[in-house]
């Protein structure tokens, strides 16, 4: 559901009617966009500085042009709960329409719901306007074209289209589509809980709050919500469950409520963090051990992909379960591509992106992954602390981030 009425029948967001818009498009030329916003796995920048409404419009034109070139005239669009979202999404959609694409506007939803839309709707292209786990002044675009999540050179192709003015023109149509309810019901129908559980759900004021607590409750769990109101200021903690400091409140709540489990989601809901009943943070590579054991038990010989940041203990464990371990490059787009190539049924990254192909679609989905975890734990007589204690742990160095300027980071990487 959109907060702002994007278009009426006669005019676009610039106040132009159809004929005026066609004339304007034929003579319009894109400005020079900062190369720094075109990243390895997405397009991302600081709103009002490197990312403006004008930037969003031209990115929409480029995405639409590329989608049409791939034979996909329909594009789904979603956005997270950031304060800049309503205005930026208008210009993004207008750019897509002016490329000649039709747009299915699915409103304010988690990123996995956008991926879901790109799988179940007529069009297999989609754009998610999201800043993910970044600070409130950021926003960006995660892009699927013709079923492929863009990365690396594919993202640079969009930049080159804009710079060379290699952009299609047309007049598309937009319609609002409710995909969230369908996503909710499909997960609800897929998950079979053996017993109810008491779960603390921390959405970090991110967009997962529109569905995660309600879904987990619908699965039969008692939910204690924590920061589930969508607020683009992220007033309580940074929406990144990969950082232990962001789980302090969740751990305290799990202990005080004597809950069976704590779940935390990042800003756009494509990653999940896990805390046991004892307050132990479960790192994603250990979570993947449990998921791999479960998936391989039904699918002997299945490929299980993990990124290079994960523990080396995954290789012998997956082999011991009867699966085939595959180490791969870090990056959600790269993992999804590898899954398609190999036919893998499960993949995971140390960042908390978990990808299920068994019973699901193969995209990273923190909400579905949380539901699968609840299903597995509900079938075990042991508590979560005991279940994860059975898997080996390592002493590992936390991720070390070196602060550099935005302008210098690419030069440093190329050196």
Predicted feature locations:
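Glycine-rich phosphate-binding loop
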Residues: 124-138, 254-276, 281, 324-365
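Active-site nucleophile and cofactor-binding loops and adjacent substrate-binding regions
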Residues: 103-112, 281-284, 306-307, 328
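Short glycine-rich phosphate-binding loop at a beta-alpha junction
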Residues: 72-80, 104, 198-200, 302-308, ...
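An N-terminal, well-structured beta->alpha segment
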Residues: 2-92, 98-99, 177-197
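Gly/Ser/Thr-enriched, mixed-charge loops and adjacent short helices
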Residues: 139-257
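N-terminal small/polar loop signature for handling phosphorylated ligands or for N-terminal nucleophile
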Residues: 69, 73-138, 185, 214-275
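Phosphate-binding and adjacent anionic-ligand microenvironments
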Residues: 299-415
């Amino acid at each position: 559901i959109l907060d702002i009425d994007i278009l009426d029948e006669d005019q676009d967001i610039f106040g132009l009617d159809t004929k005026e818009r066609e004339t304007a498009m034929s003579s319009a030329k894109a400005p020079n966009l900062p190369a720094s916003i075109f990243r390895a796995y997405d397009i991302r920048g600081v709103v009002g500085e490197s990312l403006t409404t004008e930037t969003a419009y031209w990115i929409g034109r480029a995405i639409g042009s590329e989608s049409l070139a791939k034979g996909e005239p329909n594009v789904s669009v979603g956005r997270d709960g950031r304060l800049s979202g309503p205005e930026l999404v208008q210009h993004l959609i207008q750019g897509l329409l002016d490329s000649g694409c039709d747009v299915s506007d699915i409103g304010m939803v988690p990123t996995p719901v956008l991926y879901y839309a790109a799988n179940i709707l007529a069009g297999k292209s989609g754009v998610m306007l999201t800043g993910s786990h970044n600070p409130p002044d950021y926003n960006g675009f995660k892009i699927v074209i013709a079923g492929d999540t863009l990365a690396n050179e594919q993202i640079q192709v969009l930049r080159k289209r804009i710079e060379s003015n290699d952009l299609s023109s047309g007049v598309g149509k937009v319609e609002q589509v409710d995909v969230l309810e369908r996503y909710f019901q499909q997960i609800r129908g897929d998950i079979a809980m053996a017993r109810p559980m008491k779960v603390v759900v921390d959405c970090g004021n991110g967009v997962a709050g529109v569905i995660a607590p309600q879904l987990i409750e619908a699965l039969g769990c008692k939910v204690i919500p924590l920061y589930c109101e969508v607020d683009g200021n992220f007033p309580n903690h940074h929406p990144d469950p990969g950082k232990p400091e962001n789980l302090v409140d969740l751990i305290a709540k799990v202990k005080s409520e004597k809950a069976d489990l704590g779940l935390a989601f990042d800003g756009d809901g494509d990653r999940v963090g896990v805390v046991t009943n004892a307050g132990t943070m479960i790192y994603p590579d250990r979570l993947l051990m449990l998921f791999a054991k479960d998936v391989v038990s039904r699918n002997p010989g299945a490929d299980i992909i993990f990124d290079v940041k994960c523990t080396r203990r995954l290789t012998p464990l997956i082999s011991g379960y009867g699966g085939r371990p595959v180490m791969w490059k870090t990056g959600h787009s790269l993992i999804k591509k590898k899954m398609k190539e190999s036919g893998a049924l499960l993949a995971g990254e140390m960042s908390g992106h978990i990808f299920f192909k068994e019973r699901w679609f193969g995209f990273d989905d923190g909400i579905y992954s949380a539901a699968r975890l609840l299903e597995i734990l509900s079938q075990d007589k042991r508590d979560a602390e005991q279940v994860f204690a059975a898997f080996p742990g390592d002493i590992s160095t936390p991720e070390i981030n070196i602060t550099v300027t935005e302008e210098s980071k690419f030069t440093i990487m190329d050196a």
